[in-house]
C-alpha cells in the first residue's frame, strides 16, 4: 500500500537531506524532490532514493512546448520515479504529449499528475496574470482538462479537493501541498490546511515539507503524523 504521506526534501545540501532520509521508512512515506534539490544534486540523487526503495515524486512541474515536455517526462521516468508532474496551464496538447510519452512503460509507468493553481496564490493574484476565474473555478477547470487528457490526477490545495473529486471522479488522484501543522505559521503558502482537515476533504496524498524538515526533531513529527493518518 502506498503511504499517504509525502515528505518534501526541502534542503539545500545532500548531507542534510540524507540525514533525514536515513531516519525514514519507505513503507511509511514517499519522498518529494523539487527543483532546488534536483538542480543541485541531479539525477544521481534521485536514483539513490529509488535504490533505497523509496517512492519518489519528482516535482519539476514541466511546462513547455508539447515535444519538450514529452521528452522531459520520458527522461524522468527513466530514473524510476513513482510520480511526475506538469503544469496543467500548458494546455491539452502538452498534457496529452506527456501522457503519450509514458506509454512505453506500460503498467510500470510513473503516475502523471498536473499542477492546477499553486498554493502560494491568493485570490487577487489570478487577475494579475489575466485569469478572471476564482481560485476554485480555475483549479477545477484545470483539473477537468487534466482528466480529459488522461492524466492520473492533480496537485491541488485541499480547499479544492471536494469539487475536483465531484467533477473528475473519486479515483482521480489529488496530491495536496500547503499542509501545515496546527502550530505552524503559513509562511509563503496562502491556502493551507492541517493533515486531518485535508484527509477529511478527500486528499489522497499529503505533501509536507517545512513542518518536518525545519522541526527541532523531524523524526518525532513524522511519527506523530503517521499515527494521526
From Swiss-Prot:
GO CC list: cytosol
Domain of life: Bacteria
Active site: 61
Keyword Lyase appears in the UniProt entry: yes
CDD domains documented for this protein: OMP_decarboxylase_like
One biological process term in Gene Ontology: 'de novo' pyrimidine nucleobase biosynthetic process
Enzyme Commission identifier(s): 4.1.1.23
One annotated GO molecular function: orotidine-5'-phosphate decarboxylase activity
Cross-referenced PROSITE patterns: OMPDECASE (PS00156)
Reactions this protein catalyses: orotidine 5'-phosphate + H(+) = UMP + CO2
Positions annotated to bind substrate: 10, 32, 59-68, 119, 180, 189, 209-210
Classification via InterPro entries: Aldolase_TIM, OMPdecase, OMPdecase_AS, OMPdecase_bac, OMPdeCOase_dom, RibuloseP-bd_barrel
Enzyme class: lyase
Family classification: Belongs to the OMP decarboxylase family. Type 1 subfamily.
Subunit record text: Homodimer.
Function summary: Catalyzes the decarboxylation of orotidine 5'-monophosphate (OMP) to uridine 5'-monophosphate (UMP).
Protein name: Orotidine 5'-phosphate decarboxylase
Upper lineage: Bacteria, Pseudomonadati, Pseudomonadota, Gammaproteobacteria, Legionellales
Gene designation: pyrF
